[in-house]
């Protein structure tokens, strides 16, 4: 994993992508995500964030309990990891992850063909149009180490950085 600083001023270029997602079209969404990762890498981006539940769409509702959909997501992540093996970019991609009887709303953290870990959503909204507790379990209190997408063990945990503070440079990077 070579993430050398590409700019002379010592900054890493980061980006967020918001590709068009089709509900339950895991293969199509994986292809669009791969395009976004490749384009970002070509532009010198070193860290890319893709949307929550990128592989399924956020509105898949009760389909999140469909084992075929869950297996398709894991297979798509295997493909994405394989096809990004040569890229020097860290990226996250959202997908549901089943562990035992629970399904977690996760972001897979990936780089150079490796699954570095899975960050699970801790606070699940359950009001108005949000019914996440119907489909997902909150992140486990303690990190779990699991085998997923042909790799592992990898951590599945909730990560909070509430103690960090950031400074805006005010410069167009």
Where are these regions (language model features)?
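Enzyme catalytic cores with a strong preference for nitrogen-chemistry domains
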Residues: 1-171
């Amino acid at each position: 994993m070579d993430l050398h600083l590409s700019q002379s001023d010592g900054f890493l270029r980061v980006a967020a992508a918001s590709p068009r997602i089709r509900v339950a079209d895991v293969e199509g969404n994986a292809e669009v995500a791969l395009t976004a990762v490749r384009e970002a890498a070509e532009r010198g981006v070193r860290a890319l964030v893709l949307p929550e539940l990128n592989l399924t769409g956020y509105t898949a509702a009760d389909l999140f309990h469909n084992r075929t959909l869950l297996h398709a997501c894991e297979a798509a992540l295997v493909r994405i990891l394989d096809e990004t093996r040569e890229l020097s970019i860290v990226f996250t991609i959202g997908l549901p992850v089943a562990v035992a009887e629970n399904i977690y709303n996760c972001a897979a953290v990936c780089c150079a063909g490796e699954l570095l870990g899975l960050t699970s959503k801790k606070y699940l909204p359950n009001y108005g149009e949000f019914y996440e507790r119907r489909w997902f379990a909150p992140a486990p209190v303690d990190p779990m180490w699991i085998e997923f997408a042909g790799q592992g063990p990898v951590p599945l945990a909730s990560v909070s950085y509430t103690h960090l503070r950031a400074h805006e440079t005010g410069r167009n990077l």
